[in-house]
């Protein structure tokens, strides 16, 4: 497995919103899901990897869903 050239991370204050944003991120760009988990009570962390442009697109999509 080749290592991703870029990684991006988003932290959400709601597990439900984080899960929805994760889904949107993976549907928007060709990125690999590296980490998706709760990190403490009610918070959700998503880390994706891939090309720089794909990671930027995925992060933008995730941020839009998380608002």
Identify the function of each model-found stretch:
Residues 2-49, 53-54:
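The feature marks the first
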Residues 29-30, 63-67:
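A common structural junction motif
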Residues 55-64:
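Alpha/propeptide regions of enzymes that mature by internal proteolysis
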């Amino acid at each position: 497995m080749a290592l991703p050239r870029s990684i991006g991370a988003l932290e959400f204050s709601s597990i439900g919103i984080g899960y929805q944003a994760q889904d949107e991120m993976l549907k928007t760009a060709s990125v690999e899901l590296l980490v998706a988990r709760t990190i403490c009570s009610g918070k959700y962390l998503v880390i994706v990897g891939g090309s720089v442009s794909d990671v930027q697109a995925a992060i933008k999509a995730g941020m839009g869903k998380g608002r």
